[in-house]
Amino acid sequence: MNRKKALVPFLLLLAIVVLSIVFPAVSKTPADAPAGINSADTAWMLTAAALVLIMTPGLAFFYGGMVSKKNVISTMLQSFISMAVITILWVIVGFSLAFGDSFHGIIGNPGTFFLMKDMLNGKPWALAPTIPLILFAFYQLKFAIITPALITGAFAERIKFTSYILFICLFCLFVYCPLAHATWHPDGLLFKYGVLDFAGGTVVHMSAGWAALASAIYLKRRNEEAHSPARITYVLLGTGLLWFGWFGFNAGSAFGANALATTALATTTTASAAAAFTWIIFDAL
């Protein structure tokens, strides 16, 4: 039985290799970069993508510092595993479901960008015309990664690790991707109704919030009455990483090094500082 379990990772790796050969992401005939690509915008979005990814480890520290000592590692691992699992799903089919050819404005065609097909030399995304399509895809990936990780705070210390992995897979494919398509795709149902989600207020935070509420109601409250955070230093470190990463999250949503990105960065800085100071005042009272 153990030998069969040990073969599973190798079989999965073999399947990915075979699929990569059958559906190569790189075109057989090299082509020049699409017209309209701006180097400054590309450089900024590369930076923004890295900043947003930092938020997930920051979230791991933030939640890990709040739980009891015996559950610190498992709670932090829930955020970290999201980076691995969601990335694989996104590369295989997630980006296609979110941004592929629209099916009645609800979901994307899973075959449009299956295994990142034709992404390297593909036409830039309509709403981000100055950066490569592959960069847009991987910037959006960072949003998809942190969204299920946000939910973990609602059921911390009350879910099995294997159940959590299944949960984030189902959430990504059946909640996040359809909502992202409906909201951010030019042919999306909500987009056509004029819904404006600049930096994930609907796609990321509302979906995570409702899922967190449903999870908390279903799993009930913790058994322990008294609870003390395991590591306040982890909470502070996580807060700092989240604050830092949020500049890429919000300012990066302008998809370019422009005035809109500057405004988003300034607003993020001011709002974060005001919120932190207000919290300190109320906590002191």
Regions picked out by a protein language model, each given a short descriptive name:
Residues M1-L285:
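Hydrophobic alpha-helical transmembrane bundles of multi-pass membrane proteins
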